[in-house]
C-alpha cells in the first residue's frame, strides 16, 4: 500500500504534466479553453482522476470531453515518461463542478441579501400592532365599594379552575 503523501505528490505532478501536455503537445482546437483544476490518485497509484473546467456552453463541454477521451493515450504515455513510477496510472477525466456550485451559491447569497434588505426596509417603516401597551390592564370600577380584594381573589380562582359558564 502506498503512502498517502506519495499519492498526493503524484497527483499534483500528474495535474502539472497533463496541463502542460494539453498546452504544448496536444494540438486539438477543442481543448483550447480547458483548465486542469485538480487530480486525485488512488492509494495503490494505479488510477488517476483528473478534474477540468471548460469555458463555454454545454456543446463546448461535450466536445471537450470527447477531445480529452481521444487524447488520453498521449497524455498517459507522457505521464508515464515523466513520473518514473512502476505502473503508469490510468487517466480518467471528470468535469469539475466546483465553479458551477460556487456560482450557484453566490446567486443564493445575493438573493438572501436582497431578502434581508427588504425585511430591513419593511421593519424600518413598520408600526406596532395594537395599543402602545399590548398587555391587558384591569380597570377598576368606580361603583365597587370594595378595595378590589374580592376581584383579585376571584381572578386567581378563575385561573386555577378555568373559565366557568354562567
UniProtKB/Swiss-Prot annotation:
InterPro entries listed in its UniProt record: KH_dom-like_a/b, RbfA, RbfA_dom_sf, Ribosome-bd_factorA_CS
Segments of skewed composition (Acidic residues): 139-150
GO biological process terms held by the UniProt record: maturation of SSU-rRNA
A cellular component annotation (GO) from this entry: cytosol
SUPFAM superfamilies referenced in this protein's UniProt entry, alphabetically: Ribosome-binding factor A, RbfA (SSF89919)
Region: Disordered, residue numbers: 122-166
Location of the protein in the cell: Cytoplasm
Principal location class: cytoplasm
Comp. bias regions, Basic and acidic residues: 128-138, 151-166
Keyword field: Cytoplasm, Ribosome biogenesis
Pfam families: RBFA
Gene3D superfamilies in alphabetical order: 3.30.300.20
Highest taxon in the source lineage: Bacteria
Molecular function GO terms recorded: ribosomal small subunit binding
Subunit structure: Monomer. Binds 30S ribosomal subunits, but not 50S ribosomal subunits or 70S ribosomes.
Task performed by this protein: One of several proteins that assist in the late maturation steps of the functional core of the 30S ribosomal subunit. Associates with free 30S ribosomal subunits (but not with 30S subunits that are part of 70S ribosomes or polysomes). Required for efficient processing of 16S rRNA. May interact with the 5'-terminal helix region of 16S rRNA.
HAMAP family linked: RbfA
Family: Belongs to the RbfA family.
Protein name: Ribosome-binding factor A
